[in-house]
Amino acid sequence: MEKEINPTAESLPEENASVENISEKISTPQEAEVKPKKVRGRKARKALEAEIAASKPTIYINNVDIFQRNLLVLPHVNLTIQQGEFVYLIGKTGSGKSSILKLLIADEKVHNGEAWIAGYNLATIKKRHVPYLRRKMGIVFQDYQLLQDKTVDENLFFMLRATGWKNRAEMEKRVTQVLTMVDLHTKGHKYPHQLSGGEQQRVCIARALLNDPAVLLADEPTGNLDPITSEEIFQVFHEINKRGTTVLIATHHFLMI
């Protein structure tokens, strides 16, 4: 199911904010306060935490204020995204889209309210656990951020080794799989400068898929691309979503949707 969300401050009421959907209205009212269960012992606490995490949607933001460099840009944000959904986060530059994504990857703190992604409580997550969180999500930015002195294959092997992969045969198999997903299976030997802008962004998408993420987040992934190439990149995201991956794309290119 595809949703389009506009995160501008004007679309968020001051009280009990809901998110205005261009094609439908998604309403996430404030939850009634529930007194936490009293548990004793480390195992019991962990079991309760796991139970709570399992009950949450893939992405869940409840009454959270979104900041940019200590400046409040979006008050009382509520957002619920279920597993397998495809959501566009639409807004002009500076409207808070990127700040929402930074919060979701634990680059920004949760100052109030409640925020969860892929079973992790962003309000309480410890720094040492952030790398584990990010292995459960794929992240694609506007800038390609590829290693220019390495081939496409080498860029992907580098990421696999950085995230704990060791078996060469398994790594080669996974690289082939993700490059096939983005229709670049014949380009593994090429260097980034030998690829078009659209092809480089496809490599970044393939890199984001290496660890089979539950969630794929993209921040202005077509910002540097022409309209035709942008449309092709959006189609790649849709194909990924059809395989069951939750996709959240922040973009100002609402005409491309």
Question: What does each of the following model-derived ranges do?
Answer:
Residues 216-219:
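Catalytic Walker B motif of ABC-type/P-loop ATPase nucleotide-binding domains
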